[in-house]
């Protein structure tokens, strides 16, 4: 399934999942993002790399950060951008995903950025587009969110340098989190020293040990000596049945507080993919505190999404300069 992402020369054609991408390719994405990272501070916040290309954002789930940063990334690359409003589209009249796709293809689009509640939706679209069209997965069900993982890897690399000596803890709703799956694969591929997952048994997927992680049900034990803490949103909308007694009890056991964070290394950083539920996954004193790099993650999302857009379009990326 991962081979669909690469062309015959091993270059990115689609960006659907971290799985199947090697360390060299992930590092190239990070390095390419670095070349775009200063564009937002320039007087002219554009480079002409995708001028004349048309990118369609197909978001079948709600989004703030992901949609806005993909749109901004495309515009900073000088692409033409169309956001499909699913609530007012013909999908509300029963039109199938494939028929929607074919209609958009007839408009000669060059890339689809897709978010969908069904796992595998981005792969389905990638299998049905013409060879010149690229697909980027902006989140599919509980399966994958590769660009979020890569913006988090960029954030970690900027603060911590290399990965092999790091201890990283991922805390919370691992079971329903596409972010967690992508983070684990990215951290493992980049050679992270130790990956910990901290969660109640009811919020862990089966056979999670096979991903090479260390499991902790006691948050305090799991946070001891870690360099990076990634907290996850509690995804009530994806839960079936009673997975938790109450949000209050969840916060007592798995909410990140200053007291619990003190068990990590003194220079530890705190991350969250958003949206944040304050008082459930994390307290405000931590989310807004000196260890938090949550807003940096959002900023890095633009550079990462510029990088994967340029790379999947197979556009050579020179040193970033202002558009003329």
From Swiss-Prot:
Keywords, A to Z, come to: Pyrimidine biosynthesis, Transferase
Coiled coil spans: none
Q: Which domain of life is it from?
A: Bacteria
What molecular function terms (GO) are annotated for this protein? amino acid binding; aspartate carbamoyltransferase activity
One Gene Ontology term, aspect cellular component? cytosol
Q: Does the keyword Transferase apply?
A: yes
Decide whether keyword Transferase is in the record: yes
**What are the binding positions for L-aspartate in this chain?**
93, 178, 233
Q: Which residues bind carbamoyl phosphate?
A: 65-66, 115, 145, 148, 274-275
Q: Which GO terms describe its biological process?
A: 'de novo' pyrimidine nucleobase biosynthetic process; 'de novo' UMP biosynthetic process; amino acid metabolic process
Pathway this chain belongs to: Pyrimidine metabolism; UMP biosynthesis via de novo pathway; (S)-dihydroorotate from bicarbonate: step 2/3
**Reaction equations catalysed:** carbamoyl phosphate + L-aspartate = N-carbamoyl-L-aspartate + phosphate + H(+)
EC numbers listed for it are 2.1.3.2
Q: Which InterPro entries match?
A: Asp/Orn_carbamoyltranf_P-bd (IPR006132), Asp/Orn_carbamoylTrfase (IPR006130), Asp/Orn_carbamoylTrfase_sf (IPR036901), Asp_carbamoyltransf (IPR002082), Asp_carbamoyltransf_Asp/Orn-bd (IPR006131)
- State the family named in the UniProt similarity comment for this chain: Belongs to the aspartate/ornithine carbamoyltransferase superfamily. ATCase family.
**Quaternary assembly:** Heterododecamer (2C3:3R2) of six catalytic PyrB chains organized as two trimers (C3), and six regulatory PyrI chains organized as three dimers (R2).
What the protein does comes down to:
Catalyzes the condensation of carbamoyl phosphate and aspartate to form carbamoyl aspartate and inorganic phosphate, the committed step in the de novo pyrimidine nucleotide biosynthesis pathway.
Q: Which HAMAP family match?
A: Asp_carb_tr (MF_00001)
What protein name does the entry list? Answer: Aspartate carbamoyltransferase catalytic subunit
Higher taxonomy = Bacteria, Pseudomonadati, Pseudomonadota, Gammaproteobacteria, Chromatiales
Instruction: List the gene name.
Output: pyrB
């Amino acid at each position: 399934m991962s081979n669909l992402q690469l062309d015959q020369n091993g270059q990115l054609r689609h960006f659907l999942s971290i799985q199947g991408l090697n360390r060299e390719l992930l590092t190239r994405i990070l390095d390419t993002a670095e070349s775009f990272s200063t564009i937002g501070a320039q007087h002219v916040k554009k480079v002409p790399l995708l001028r004349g290309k048309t990118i369609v954002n197909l978001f079948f789930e709600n989004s703030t950060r992901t949609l806005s940063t993909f749109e901004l990334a495309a515009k900073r690359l000088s692409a033409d951008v169309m956001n499909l409003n699913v609530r007012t589209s013909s999908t509300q009249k029963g039109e199938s995903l494939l028929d929607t796709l074919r209609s958009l293809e007839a408009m000669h689009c060059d890339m689809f950025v897709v978010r969908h509640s069904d796992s595998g939706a981005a792969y389905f679209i990638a299998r049905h587009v013409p060879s010149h069209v690229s697909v980027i997965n902006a989140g599919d069900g509980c399966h994958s969110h590769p660009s979020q993982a890569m913006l988090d890897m960029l954030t970690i690399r900027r603060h911590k340098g290399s990965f092999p000596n790091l201890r990283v803890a991922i805390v919370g709703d691992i079971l329903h989190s596409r972010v967690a799956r992508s983070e684990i694969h990215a951290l493992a591929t980049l050679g992270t020293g130790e990956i910990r997952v901290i969660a109640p048994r009811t919020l862990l997927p089966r056979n999670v040990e096979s991903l090479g992680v260390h499991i902790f049900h006691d948050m305090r034990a799991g946070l001891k000596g870690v360099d990076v803490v990634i907290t996850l949103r509690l995804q009530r909308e994806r839960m079936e049945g009673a997975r938790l007694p109450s949000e209050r009890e969840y916060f007592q056991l798995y909410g990140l507080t200053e007291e619990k964070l003190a068990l990590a290394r003194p220079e530890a950083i705190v991350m969250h993919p958003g949206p944040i539920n304050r008082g459930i996954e994390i307290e405000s004193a931590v989310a807004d505190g000196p260890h938090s790099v949550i807003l940096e993650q959002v900023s890095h999302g633009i550079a990462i999404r510029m990088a994967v857009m340029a790379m999947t379009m197979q556009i050579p990326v020179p040193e970033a300069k202002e558009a003329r």
